[in-house]
């Protein structure tokens, strides 16, 4: 059963797809298979992801059925999908419609595939989860350990080269750019060797956040920075090693969020 928020989003996506096909009929097969043949957002996303992650050894149909079953029994995952689509649409200036993340943004695809692998990990289907992690890394160049904990309203922008380790915790409404590493320092081997990223954090391209540390709410991490120590909330940090350069006004608004018209 669809939530009202999912249903409204899905109807907007389908309507946009129909309008686009009038201008670009050559995309008919792609749009029919990916969007217009489906009654639900979850069915569409299962189709898109299974097409990208299948191999000659595990078929598209088998992966589609696995994903569809997970979505059918876990409304919370679909709720996160909806929030992720909206996050990309609100924060990425090149995204003009909700259809764009669903069809074209590999950061979104990698994130939603991770959510499915995370579910499988949590029910102890470790081998299938590991298979999906490997395929996600190969196809999207994004390496997220299925045991990592990631909230909703997440944007992985460009996404190439993002690495998120096993013990990482990411709260809601976080934006992460390409080539970011959230990992360990190599000095600890326990599960608590990775960072915690609080809500509304923005992590610039190429930044590395390493070790059992906490990045506070609303922090902005500059591109290329290396963070090795706890960062208090509502500051901007840059440099190697990262240092605080200014304080930020307490706000729940993400740095790149577009104003509503």
From Swiss-Prot:
GO cellular component terms, A-Z: cytoplasm
Subcellular location(s) of the protein: Cytoplasm
Any GO MF annotation of the entry: serine O-acetyltransferase activity
The entry's keywords: Acyltransferase, Amino-acid biosynthesis, Cysteine biosynthesis, Cytoplasm, Repeat, Transferase
Gene3D superfamilies in the record: Hexapeptide repeat proteins (2.160.10.10), serine acetyltransferase, domain 1 (1.10.3130.10)
GO biological process: cysteine biosynthetic process from serine
Pathway: Amino-acid biosynthesis; L-cysteine biosynthesis; L-cysteine from L-serine: step 1/2
E.C. number(s) listed in UniProt: 2.3.1.30
Enzyme class, broadest EC rank: transferase
Protein name in UniProt: Serine acetyltransferase
Name of the gene this protein is made from: cysE
């Amino acid at each position: 059963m669809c939530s009202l928020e999912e249903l409204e989003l899905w109807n907007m996506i389908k309507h946009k797809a129909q309008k686009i096909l009038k201008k670009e009929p050559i995309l008919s097969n792609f749009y029919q298979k990916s969007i217009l043949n489906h009654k639900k957002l979850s069915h569409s996303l299962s189709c898109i992801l299974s097409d990208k992650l299948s191999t000659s050894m595990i078929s598209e149909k088998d992966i589609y059925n696995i994903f569809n079953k997970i979505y059918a029994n876990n409304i919370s995952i679909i709720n996160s999908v909806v929030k992720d689509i909206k996050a990309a649409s609100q924060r990425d200036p090149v995204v003009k419609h909700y259809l764009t993340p669903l069809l074209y943004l590999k950061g979104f695809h990698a994130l939603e595939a991770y959510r499915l692998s995370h579910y499988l990990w949590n029910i102890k289907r470790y081998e299938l989860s590991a298979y999906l992690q490997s395929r996600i890394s190969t196809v999207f160049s994004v390496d997220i350990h299925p045991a990592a904990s990631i909230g909703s309203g997440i944007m992985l922008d460009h996404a190439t080269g993002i690495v998120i380790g096993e013990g990482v915790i990411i709260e809601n409404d976080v934006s992460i750019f390409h080539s970011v590493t959230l990992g360990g320092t190599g000095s600890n081997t326990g599960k608590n060797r990775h960072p915690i990223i609080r809500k509304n954090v923005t992590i610039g391209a190429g930044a590395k956040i390493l070790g059992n540390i906490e990045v506070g709410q609303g922090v902005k991490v500059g591109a290329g920075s290396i963070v090795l120590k706890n960062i208090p909330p509502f500051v901007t940090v840059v440099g190697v090693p990262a240092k605080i350069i200014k304080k930020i006004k307490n706000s729940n608004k993400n740095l790149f969020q577009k104003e509503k018209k």
